[in-house]
């Protein structure tokens, strides 16, 4: 049988390579077949590859691995954009070019030209196909008999002889929670065995357990009078004042506390949550925010402040820009209003120190822009920590 010319292993597909036994400095080409590739050294193969051009290397790579299955589909297509760009990318010009090309390009020729009124293909008729296959009496000629009750007797015997503990697990797996208590049901779902604590029968009594006693939180025992005196004296050790949940403190004492806090240059946290203060007592906080360079956290949640006063408090933080956390949620008037929300949003965007704001905005735009402003402030803090200029 003669060898075909297109055979891959024919003599025409051999290539020349320097012999491994030839002397150094001489290059005597010799034909190497597939069986002789094992005798070649790595240096000879590297020399052959280095002499190939880029196009030849690409063809060789396609022959060895036309479609690398180890790569994801998005990386299998090789770069075919070798042509240099003629100019900057302009989307409008590209769309106009594609539109003009689509209008001027000739449509594909149809093998069967369109003729009005002519139907192509077979029209589907569900009734005709069904009537042709089904008999007149509506039954199949050779019905298939399926017996689903072959193992009914064995199943009954297994259920009768099964212990009640296994029946409890089976009821839990089948979701029959009405005949089980909660520990039995959840143990069956998790695959845990029933024990004496949960009960192994349907009528078993579950053992009681002593509930864990959680002690109540102690009352706030802050001495308001002592805080007022220490704030007036500008005590360097007093950096936090917390009178949360102290509704029995009189309004006059709260006003005096806020006025005394304005004299302190070392206070960092001031909490007045759930103290039933209104706008008349909280107006002094505006002066406190504008004059205190050390104040970092202000908490006035769960009070009776109006949205207008909250907007003024946020606007006053722009004077020193030292407030890091501002909490004012859960007020009597839950709806702030669109105009007030926009005012608060702009104040937060202008502030470069706020990191946490506890206010519920109803507007989607306000929530989105406030979130972006706080992210920018966090980025400034990160750049300062790395020793970079946040304004660059």
From Swiss-Prot:
Keywords: Actin-binding, Cytoplasm, Cytoskeleton. It is found in: Cytoplasm, Cytoskeleton. This is Tropomodulin. Acts as the pointed end capping protein which maintains the length and dynamics of the actin filament. Blocks the elongation and depolymerization of the actin filaments at the pointed end. Coiled coil: none annotated. Residues 16-29 have a biased composition (Polar residues). The keyword Plastid does not apply. Belongs to the tropomodulin family. Its main location: cytoplasm.
